[in-house]
């Protein structure tokens, strides 16, 4: 019996839930899940019925690159902000649920992608040049 408990604990230790934390864009707080693995980024916000007012997902990539996103199995409209490695907002786009028909492309130097509720960037007046600030626990990734 003890063997099975040890095995179960070992297997469960590999099942990590997403890291959560508060980030800021120009001192505006957002409570986000962190997506750093290809699997986490691919899952994104699929199947979510809603997000709270300042809740979202922050994707982090291994290196600056052009990122392509789609809305496959995403049920809610989103605002997406593309940031470079220094945390500067490069561009935003609005994405509507469409079953994954349209591809959205980021600027080539994208390192972070922030997915939030539709109109989040406009509501807070966040434009290109706004600054992303991460907690220390997120900077390890």
List where the protein language model places each region.
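C-terminal motif of bacterial Sec signal peptides marking the signal peptidase cleavage site
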Residues: 12-14
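N-terminal hydrophobic targeting signals that begin at the initiator methionine
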Residues: 1-2, 16
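Compact, glycine-rich, soluble single-domain proteins
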Residues: 16-141
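Sec-dependent signal peptide recognition
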Residues: 2-8
């Amino acid at each position: 019996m003890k063997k099975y408990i040890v095995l179960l604990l070992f297997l469960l230790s590999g099942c990590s839930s997403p890291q959560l934390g508060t980030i800021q864009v120009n001192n505006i707080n957002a409570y986000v899940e962190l997506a750093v693995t290809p699997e986490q980024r691919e899952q994104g916000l699929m199947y979510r019925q809603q997000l709270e007012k300042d809740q979202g997902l922050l994707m982090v990539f291994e290196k600056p690159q052009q990122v392509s996103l789609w809305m496959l199995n995403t049920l809610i409209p989103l605002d997406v902000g593309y940031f470079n490695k220094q945390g500067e907002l490069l561009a935003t786009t609005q994405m509507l649920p469409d079953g994954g028909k349209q591809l959205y492309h980021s600027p080539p130097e994208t390192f972070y992608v922030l997915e939030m509720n539709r109109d989040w960037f406009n509501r807070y007046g966040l434009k290109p040049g706004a600054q992303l600030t991460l907690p220390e626990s997120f900077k390890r990734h």
